[in-house]
Regions:
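Helix-to-loop junction immediately C-terminal to a conserved catalytic motif
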Residues: 78
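Conserved ABC transporter NBD signature motif
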Residues: 86-95
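ABC ATPase NBD coupling module
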Residues: 95-111, 255-258
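Conserved ABC ATPase "signature" region
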Residues: 142-159
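Conserved ABC ATPase signature
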Residues: 164-168, 172
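Conserved catalytic motifs of ABC-family nucleotide-binding domains
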Residues: 185
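Catalytic Walker B motif of ABC-type/P-loop ATPase nucleotide-binding domains
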Residues: 189-192
Length: 274
């Protein structure tokens, strides 16, 4: 499909796969189909027969309890882990494991913002953002500088360009991490718990920046989060990992007012306050 970013098809994923080395990183946004984990020992299954599709320019949030495989899904999409079974399609194309030639092309088109920001401690903000651009030789020095400045302006961190990570608040570190990923011009951006550890002030300041980025540049985004209100504030669909599979995607309000088992579990506090 021309408008398809990511598709996961019949994916099975096991805990043992998460310690693997870099595999084949997707070239773009994708779809998962029947993704499964280990069949030999179901205790170690994280995902079993999961399917998910995502259109170009779409944003989706993945919710669910800790330890159920949400972050593992992101690692798999980014190429840091591989499914035991199933297929991942990036922009409508399946890239088999043996296509190692596609690795470098692929990983430049998938950005991954880790929960802890993962900034290089001895590099200033400007150099943290420029590092992957320089490593992959993505332009001349002048072109890289322009991209870095655009990323800093987008996430409003230019005033902190010459500061080191330890001099920044947690909220500002997350902004820098997002700027670093965005500067690579990814077609698919993965975010793992972007609001974790933020106070209300920093959270309120971060979400409009993410919203502005996706609307201005049509970036396709997958957000793994415990903060389900993100789906409401970004007006995007929300899916849950439930019984090792993805639910159908629905709006925040749908889940909030649903009488399903998932809604009663995940929205208990919000429903009780209505």
């Amino acid at each position: 499909m021309l408008d398809e970013a990511l598709r996961l098809e019949d994916i099975y994923l096991s805990t043992s796969e998460l310690s693997g080395t870099l595999f084949s990183i997707p070239r773009a946004v994708s779809y998962f189909e029947n993704i499964r984990s280990s069949e030999s020992n179901e205790d170690y299954q994280l995902i079993a027969g999961a399917n998910l599709s995502l259109k170009l320019g779409e944003t989706i949030c993945i919710g669910g309890p800790s330890g159920k495989g949400k972050s593992a899904i992101l690692r798999m999409i980014a190429g840091l882990a591989r499914p035991l079974k199933g297929h991942i399609y990036y922009f409508g194309e399946y890239i088999p494991a043996e296509r190692l030639d596609a690795l470098e092309v692929a990983k430049r088109q998938v950005g991954f913002v880790l929960q802890n920001a993962a900034l290089i401690s001895n590099l200033r903000v400007v150099d943290n953002i420029a590092l992957p651009l320089r490593y992959h030789k993505m332009g001349t020095d002048e072109e890289i500088t322009k991209k870095v400045n655009m990323a800093m302006d987008l996430m409003r961190v230019r005033n902190f360009a010459n500061m080191f990570p330890h001099e920044l608040s947690v909220g500002m570190q997350k902004r820098v991490a997002i700027a670093r990923s965005w500067a690579m011009d990814p077609k698919l951006l993965l975010m793992d718990e972007p609001t974790a550890g933020l106070d209300n002030y920093n959270r309120r300041n971060l979400l409009p920046l993410i919203d502005n980025m996706r609307t201005m540049f049509k970036t396709t985004i997958i957000i793994v989060t415990h903060d389900l209100m993100i789906a409401k504030e970004l007006n995007c669909n929300l899916v849950f990992l439930h019984k090792k599979k993805f639910t159908e995607p629905h709006s925040f309000d749908y889940w909030l007012h649903s009488d399903s088992e998932i809604s009663k579990d995940q929205f208990r506090d919000l429903q009780s306050n209505e």
